[in-house]
Amino acid sequence: MSPIAIDTAPFQRARVNLLHPEDPKAVKSIVQLLQFNAEHNPDHVFCLQLPSKQDDAIGNPIRITHLQFYRAVSYCTQRLQEEIDGLHGPRVNEDGTVTKCSPVVLFMESNVGLLIHLLALMSLGVPVAVLSARLSPTAVQHLMSSIRAQSVIASPRLKGTIEEAIASDNNTPAIGVRMYTQRPFEDDLENSRTLDLPATNEESHFISENDRNVLILHSSGTTGLPKPIYQPHRYLLNYSECHELGPDDALGTVLSALPLFHGFGLVAPCLAMTVGKPFMLPPSNTIPTGSLIIELIQSFQPTALMTVPHILEEITTLPPEQSISALQPLEFVLCGGGPLKISVAEALAASGVNLLAHFGTTETGPLGVVFVPTPDYDWHYWKLRQDINYRLDEVDANSADGNQYKLTVHPFGWDSAFEIQDILLSRGAEYKHHLRAVGRKDDLIVLANGEKLVPRVLETLLMQDERVKSAVAFGEGKFEIGVIVEPTHKVSDEEDFKAALWAIVLEAGAQMDSHAQVSSPSSIILATPEKPVPRSDKGSILRRETYRVYDEEISRVYEVLDRASEETTALNLQSDSLEEDLKDLIQREIGWKISPSEWLQDSDLFELGMNSLQAIRLHRLLLSSLPVDSRERVGADFVYRSPSVSKLGASLRHLAANENGHRNDPETEIDELICLNSFIARQDATVLLTGSTGNLGSNLLAHLTTLPRVKKVICLNRRGSDTSTAHTDLVERQLAIAKSKGVVIDPESASKIEVIPCDPSADFFGLPAEVYTHLTAQTTHILHNAWPMDFKRNVASFQSQFQYLNNLLRVAHDTRLCRPSIKPRFLFVSSIAVVGQYPRTHGTRLIPEVPSDKSSIIEDFGYGKAKYVCEEIMRAAADRYPEMQLGIVRVGQMSGSSRTGYWNPKEHFPTLIKFASMVGQLPAIKQTLSWIAVDNAATVLSDILFAPSLSGIYHLENPIRQAWQDVLDIFASSLYINTVNVPFDQWLRNVQAAVQELGTEDERMEYDLLAEFLEKDFQRMATGKVILDTSRSRAVSETLREVGEISEEVVWKYVREWRRAGTLRAPLE
């Protein structure tokens, strides 16, 4: 292909005055800039859009002039007004205030169509949110809810993510989100050719310089979910001015390998509108790779390149005649979005490539200058703009690297300043404003492809486990992350400990974006007592110092990942079923979520939604199937070049030598295990108990072991850091845990206890065949009580719990197969949260002991949704396997032990009391409560488990209700609190203010985890508006029939126990 002809007529530049927006001759918005270019530069080329690749061929680019772009935007404006319900421009109210339409979300592939829609909505004065196409459904749902969006326009390929996000959203602000499918941009270009277009009305889209409800982008938030960032009109004008390009410098085309849904990607189109330098965009149906970019440069001969580090890194791995030589003629190669490896940059610079560093943030826009590098320029540094409001303060004049600075910027239209989190070094006195980043003050990790993530979800979930002292994610400049875990106690078997943590890592991954997941247990580094995780004097983790200390271990992690595992793949590259095996590999090994029946061997994997991390995992797996001497011929873009199973199969056959593969058949092993032995049924009960280390579980264990009918209680516990398998050690640890919760088990009862450590979500619990067979040979009753207590998690993050339940049901089923005379019993402990909305949907407070439906679950409460899913799994199992007796118990509010006073301080009401003690106030809570002490609850569960028959739904809550005011009066007395009856909402605000201002980090986290539940659901759930009917339970439980109210003596026990444990603290002042 030949170079693209570009209009060389002089480009008339519009007047832009960022620092003095009152300038009457200056344009005030990108919309006005659009119209200016249509009038003054109509035939100048704006953009060259390469069409979607067909059969691996690159077509000729679509040439779009400024006038054509303006016409397409105007046509799209009219079309959207007809298509989107409720779309309208700003409306002036009687009091002079302005009301805007709710934001419209753009969730699109990176092509010029995104720009057309963006400018169309902005010209209407409609707030527009641009979301990264790489976000997970959870992140998309969070953002749509945060900005109260009501409409979203999605590319056809991305509709599935939006549908999943909408389906999972029960939050009121985002109810009724309507999805519209993006039309091809070619339609807007074609249909606008003969359209009479009105001039843009400034008053219809421009409100004021400080109106930030114009463009909504997003970044990583402190909770690990993205946060919306609102920007004014000057934000995009800011992009258009980040240059020092003269008329000659603006000649030729810049190839942009940057996605338009990221801030960095807006640099090229905004510069095209200001200086007239056209930009070229790659096909939107393929992810840019080093080889693709080189192919485009060689085909169309642009004069400059804008890219991210990993593309340049890929380019340097290609043969020199195909790579670096193509970059050498370019006026500049602009690189930003993340750190570029020094070795790569040095190789490029030494070869004469004009590297140009760039820097910016979503909040501030571009901070670096785009220019053609001169001989005195040093590629290590980016040049700070001088047309923005900023302050550069020295923070360390004695650093070994040079003077360190912090940069504070006052973004255009903002009322407040924004401090850049990067630590910056200056090139020197002569080049003070030439800076480079040497680290970050926050926890943000920037991957090699420019993707950013905050790993707090992963780190927090790990550190909530009692076996983990600290967790630090790493991955800066790499393609994926790993995590350093510091165990609470010395670990004897590292691999077992990693396996035990893996379920937590997977749960975290379900809540994080696809690029932010840990791919393998081998990516977990265990800190040793000899090399603890570095901390400051205040005890906080020193992230960067941790990376330095564990530099060798981190390097080894990525070496192992690069080598991949030959045992994992086991592909026979000469097999006739290679394509079938490849599809199975994708389904099993890379986190693929699409059902096998929904895609074909010829389907484009990236069209189906394969992300960059999945492509990397697949690449590593495929490498292990090839002879060593063939692997070097498989570049990093191998999967991108062969983006379907059929193409991968053809490519692999071409590369492979004659090798035979082997695949194990786990189904055969399962069948053999089930039928290994047939044992004679015993008359005595053996109870398989889960969750035995919790408060309720410890009380259950103590009660069950006192029953004459119970011969043995098998505690199926999540495998922990203590890898001892000795029976005595395991039981002693179990007894110690129970004792820590005020539950003392005598030696005779303890002799009935057996402890089996396991991986709850692994097939057969990850147990050896003989141990699993031991379970099925003895178990007669299963009481499934285990459950993570976290009110912030969404339903998808409980996947391991659903697998846990299915594994237990398999035990019951296999028990029946091995011992036909046994009819196993299975009791699942559910929650009142499953029916929390029942009074609203059915018009009655008294909830019967019957199956519920989805409408009864508490809205936007993953805990309750997950319990509902488990109830439905139990009901389906009961229908399918009538030979098993299955029951469900929905538990209401349990309090601490009536005997010892132990009440887990992490539960919501003890935390509420902790907050009350901190602020010296008790809230006003009206109506009644129905607490049942945990020791009594354990007895009731046992009564139900051993009832004459077991089936259906039971409810467990105290039938005797007490006045909240009476109980709070006792707490006021025991806590010495004089300020009572503070309105609940006001009390919550007082707590929030005190915690945020004077609380510890742990206390702030406690509040964040519980605040939403207290605000939305506590008063409705806990004050008699939701009452569980206990008729069926009382019929089989004498304990529940005779239980009384929580006495004053018991309340005092709770407070004394919390004081003894140090949970309560003096009021914050």
Curated annotation (Swiss-Prot):
Originating organism: Aspergillus terreus (strain NIH 2624 / FGSC A1156)
Protein family according to the UniProt entry: Belongs to the adenylate-forming reductase family.
Top-tier EC class: oxidoreductase
Modified residues (O-(pantetheine 4'-phosphoryl)serine): S612
Induction remarks: Expression is induced by the azasperpyranone cluster A-specific transcription factor ATEG_03638 which is itself regulated by the azasperpyranone transcriptional regulator ATEG_07667.
Functional pathway: Secondary metabolite biosynthesis
E.C. number(s) listed in UniProt: 1.2.1.-
Binding site for AMP: H262, A357, H358, T362, A437, V438, G439, R440
Superkingdom of origin: Eukaryota
Gene Ontology molecular function: ATP binding; oxidoreductase activity
Pfam families: AMP-binding, AMP-binding_C_3, NAD_binding_4
Chain intervals for the UniProt region annotation (Reductase (R) domain): 686-1032
Positions contributing to NADP(+) binding: T693, G694, N695, L696, R719, N785, A786, W787, Y863, K867
Reaction catalysis annotation: 5-methylorsellinate + ATP + NADPH + H(+) = 2,4-dihydroxy 5,6-dimethylbenzaldehyde + AMP + diphosphate + NADP(+)
Free-text biotechnology note from the record: Azasperpyranones display potential anti-cancer activities. Azasperpyranones A, C, D, and F exhibit potent growth-inhibitory activity against the A549, HepG2, HCT-116, and HL-60 cell lines, with IC(50) values of 2.39-14.42 mm, respectively. Moreover, azasperpyranone D significantly inhibits HCT-116 xenograft tumor growth in BALB/c-nu mice. In addition, azasperpyranones A and C can bind with four kinds of therapeutic targets for cancer, eEF2K, FGFR, survivin, and TNF-a.
Protein name: Adenylate-forming reductase
Region entry Adenylation (A) domain, spans: 20-391
Entry note about domains: Contains three distinct domains: an adenylation (A) domain that activates the substrate amino acid which is subsequently covalently linked as a thioester (aminoacyl-S-PCP) to the 4'-phosphopantetheine prosthetic group of the second domain, the peptidyl carrier protein (PCP) domain, as well as a reductase (R) release domain.
Matches recorded under InterPro entries: ACP-like_sf (IPR036736), Adenylate-forming_Reductase (IPR051414), AMP-binding_CS (IPR020845), AMP-dep_synth/lig_dom (IPR000873), ANL_N_sf (IPR042099), Far_NAD-bd (IPR013120), NAD(P)-bd_dom_sf (IPR036291)
Stretches assigned to the Carrier domain: 576-656
